């Protein structure tokens, strides 16, 4: 029976319109599913209520595994010895103990088990695990132009088409976590700055067998193809060679990246990572709406990670997809060389900014020198992730060994939006920000980049206001003149 919903989960669902809520009564945790996602049968993500401790969560996880074992044992005894179909349930898969208080777990459970779980007082909600996939749109021949576009205010021409103007130290001291299919870490364009971080899908190899993650990594930090040419790259593999995976694996990948970031922060504070300036992350992937994934991404941002996520390639409202609908990340739509919204790019109020995403050339798999040209918001998001790393690296080092600037992800997001080139793109719906990413035109002075852009905005506003006032004054004087004229004639 759909309808009744515990009050604790209402705030979470306030912006999750594509969600279906299945709740049998008020004393049972609701089961959430997305109308635009492909569910994985009998697979769930369980999220604990706020206030539940790590100790209580561990006890609960042991409890649910015991129930699972007991139920499976009974099922095995009842099975017909001639039944060859594999009906076994795997039980607990991942545990989530996220910095800042997000606790939960995922697993493959029998309905009898999950019904007991949803009645446990510590459980806030349960979400059906679902498929996640890369957002690649098409493969076409072409030349790189995206870097040039984000370093020029004006529309590209033959003189600026292939000229990327940038600060040479861009990305230095910044770690970029690419949560995707992996990265070809031996590619020459990474100059030894790429490392394998973590493989989340069970039984998968530490290699990018798809190419999508490698392409994103190259746009972020490659020597030739990257925005932030000195950044470090860490491959976090959450999708398999096919380019698809599970929502629970993606959630676990985000947790791993955030934990790795916090370790780096700790090491820097101890003086063991001099020059460390922070961490950025890119997620050029998506699926249906997932309250859990959006929540976890926002939690990673809360602990200091700067996140860029792809808006999606459905030519639809980005708010209906995850992680595009996360509140605190930067959601990126795709633009073309002609300064149009790419025909496939999602849009809407959840889209924060646009970046080049059509015919983008970058690193690939197959050899240390392989390249490929592909399109999608998957290619736009790494431009913004690279810009996040680029701008972080321009921050002045503090007096301590921990050189992370006093700029939060929220402030960085606001600044990037404030300096973006405005109203240049065509085919932008009215509810979508018409903003195209800009890197400051090669300046290495972050404060001047931000201050100059805001000063220009103020000047433009003042100029526009003056023009309007002058027009009103002119209209007012004309009206007075006409009144006097009419009076004289009368």
Swiss-Prot record:
This is Subtilisin-like protease 8. Its main location: secreted. InterPro entries: PCSK9_ProteinaseK-like, Peptidase_S8/S53_dom, Peptidase_S8/S53_dom_sf, Peptidase_S8_His-AS, Peptidase_S8_Ser-AS, Peptidase_S8_subtilisin-like, Peptidase_S8_subtilisin-rel, S8pro/Inhibitor_I9. It is found in: Secreted. Its EC number is 3.4.21.-. Residues 144-450 form the Peptidase S8 domain. Residues 27-134 form a propeptide. It is an enzyme of class 3 (hydrolase). The lineage of its organism: Eukaryota, Fungi, Dikarya, Ascomycota, Pezizomycotina. GO terms for molecular function: serine-type endopeptidase activity. SUPFAM superfamilies: Subtilisin-like (SSF52743). Keywords: Glycoprotein, Hydrolase, Protease, Secreted, Serine protease, Signal, Virulence, Zymogen.
């Amino acid at each position: 029976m759909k309808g009744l919903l515990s009050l604790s989960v209402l705030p979470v669902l306030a912006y999750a319109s594509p969600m279906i809520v299945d709740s049998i009564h008020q004393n049972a945790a609701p089961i959430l599913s997305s109308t635009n996602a492909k569910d994985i049968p009998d697979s769930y993500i369980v999220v604990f209520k706020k206030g539940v401790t790590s100790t209580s969560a561990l006890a609960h996880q042991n409890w649910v595994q015991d129930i699972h074992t007991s139920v499976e044992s009974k099922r095995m005894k009842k099975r017909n010895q001639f039944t060859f179909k594999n009906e076994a349930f795997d039980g607990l898969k991942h545990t989530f103990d996220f910095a800042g208080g997000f606790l939960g777990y995922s697993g493959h459970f029998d309905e009898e088990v999950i019904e007991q779980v949803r009645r446990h007082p510590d459980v806030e909600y349960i979400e059906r695990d679902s498929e996640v996939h890369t957002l690649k749109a098409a493969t076409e021949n072409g030349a790189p132009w995206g870097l040039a576009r984000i370093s020029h205010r004006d529309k590209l021409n033959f003189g600026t088409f292939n000229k990327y103007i940038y600060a040479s130290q861009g990305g230095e001291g910044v770690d970029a976590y690419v949560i995707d299919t992996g990265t070809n870490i031996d590619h020459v364009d990474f100059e030894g700055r790429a490392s394998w971080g973590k493989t989340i899908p069970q039984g998968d190899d530490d290699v990018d067998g798809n190419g999508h993650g490698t392409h994103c990594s190259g746009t972020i930090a490659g020597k030739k193809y990257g925005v932030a040419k000195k950044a470090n790259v860490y491959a976090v593999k959450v999708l398999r060679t096919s380019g698809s995976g599970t929502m629970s694996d993606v959630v676990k990948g985000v947790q791993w990246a955030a934990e790795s970031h916090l370790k780096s922060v700790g090491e820097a504070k101890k003086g063991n990572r001099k020059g460390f300036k922070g961490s950025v992350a890119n997620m050029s992937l998506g699926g249906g709406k997932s309250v859990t994934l959006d929540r976890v991404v926002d939690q990673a941002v809360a602990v200091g990670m700067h996140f860029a996520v792809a808006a999606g390639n459905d030519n639809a409202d980005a708010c209906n997809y995850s992680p595009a609908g996360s509140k605190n990340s930067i959601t990126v739509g795709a633009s073309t060389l002609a300064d149009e919204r790419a025909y496939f790019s999602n849009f809407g109020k959840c889209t924060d900014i646009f970046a080049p995403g059509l015919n983008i050339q970058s690193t690939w798999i197959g050899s240390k020198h392989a390249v490929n040209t592909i399109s999608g918001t998957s290619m736009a998001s790494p431009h913004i992730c690279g810009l996040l790393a680029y701008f972080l690296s321009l921050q002045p080092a503090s007096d301590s060994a921990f050189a992370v600037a006093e700029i939060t992800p929220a402030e960085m997001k606001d600044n990037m939006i404030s300096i973006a080139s405005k109203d240049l793109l065509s085919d932008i719906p009215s509810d979508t920000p018409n903003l195209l990413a800009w890197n400051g035109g090669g300046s290495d002075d972050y404060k001047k980049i931000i201050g100059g852009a805001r000063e220009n905005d103020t000047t433009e506003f003042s100029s526009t206001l003056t023009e309007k006032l002058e027009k009103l004054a002119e209209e007012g004087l004309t009206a007075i003149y006409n009144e006097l004229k009419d009076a004289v004639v009368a």
